[in-house]
Regions:
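N-terminal, positively charged/glycine-rich alpha-helical extensions of SAM-dependent methyltransferases
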Residues: 2-9, 24-64
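A short glycine-rich, Lys/Arg-flanked "PGG" loop and its adjoining helix->strand segment in the class I
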Residues: 177-192
């Protein structure tokens, strides 16, 4: 039976909803070693599903998870703050790498307006099909183009965009330096390259069994993401790609009530921990029951750090 929160008992936890869930500057040999390590993680028996979404049997659920996360107020605040930090203004031509279902594309369209243009690329045709449907109304007000493309070999001329962004993408990439260099190539001199990622080495959550929580959270992150600690590496990554005036924005997703997106995030951690052999089913269910107890005591807290780095392409 699927691992999930026990909703039969009275609890203050909300009902389940259909939702989801860089190297530093170093000698060239060290960079090659880092890339090789990320590629090895990417080819493990339990690969990152987002690297090849179209090959997954649950891509529709993945699409719903992106939209559910996008609707979460705390996540929307994180995006708005990062886009303001870049910044993105009226009339800008902006590229989003790894646009998924177009959550950020729609945010960008509202910022650039009729005189601007937003281009979104993704490796997944199926996610882009969903994005086209969801962006149809927005595209009547702002020029939007969506296309299948490889982030490591962008199909655009040099100096084409005012800004190129990748939001919660780099942690899924085996060679992030190559991707950021491509983003810089297609950005005009004086334009901005911005990347934002979670860092799964900095997750705090209240639970009666801290050791078990650490084992599950760390074990799943190391098996699912190519680079689970991507967030802390972003400033060095931009500098290694030749960008200047690199700035760092730190932010935190926080939840004190076990919101639907957080609930599903934890359920997925439990399910994957079982699938990867980190814990058995009964242990995973006991772990989730612990959160129900914490919520009932009005003591639940989950925080996940986000890091955003923005650099300028020199003339």
């Amino acid at each position: 039976m699927p691992v999930g929160f026990d909703t039969s008992a009275a609890s203050s936890a909300p009902a389940s909803t259909p939702a989801a869930d860089a190297p530093r500057v170093s000698p060239r040999s060290s960079q090659r070693t880092a890339v090789a390590a990320r590629r090895a993680r990417a080819s493990r028996r339990h690969p990152d599903p987002w690297r090849d979404a179209d090959a997954q049997t649950n891509v529709d659920e993945m699409a719903r998870s992106l939209e559910a996360r996008g609707r979460t107020p705390a996540q929307a605040r994180l995006r708005r703050r990062f886009l303001k930090f870049v910044p993105v203004g009226s009339g800008a031509r902006v590229l989003e790498v790894g646009c998924g279902t177009g959550v950020v594309v729609r945010d960008l369209a509202a910022l650039v307006g009729r005189r601007g243009k937003v281009v979104g690329i993704d490796a997944s045709r199926r996610l882009l099909d969903r994005a086209r449907a969801l962006c149809r109304e927005t595209a009547r007000r702002t020029p939007i183009a969506l296309r299948v493309a490889d982030a490591a070999s962008l199909p655009f001329a040099a100096d084409r965009f005012d800004a190129a962004l990748a939001i919660t993408v780099i942690l899924h990439v085996a060679d992030p330096l190559r991707v950021v260099r491509e983003m810089a190539r297609v950005t005009r001199p004086g334009g901005r390259v911005g990347v934002q990622d979670q860092d799964f080495g900095v997750v705090a959550v209240t639970h009666p069994d801290r050791a078990l929580t650490e084992r599950i959270m760390r074990g799943v992150a190391e098996r699912v993401y190519v680079e689970p600690h991507s967030g802390r590496r972003l400033p060095g990554l931009l500098r290694a790609a030749g960008l200047v005036d690199v700035r760092l924005l730190t932010d935190v997703y926080q939840d004190t009530t076990l919101e639907p997106w957080t609930k599903t995030f934890l359920e997925r951690r439990a399910e994957r921990a079982v699938r990867f052999g980190i814990v058995d089913v009964s242990t995973a269910e006991r772990w989730l029951d612990g959160f129900t107890e914490v919520v009932a005591a009005d003591a639940f807290v989950l925080t996940l750090n986000y890091y955003g780095a923005v650099g300028t392409k020199s003339a």
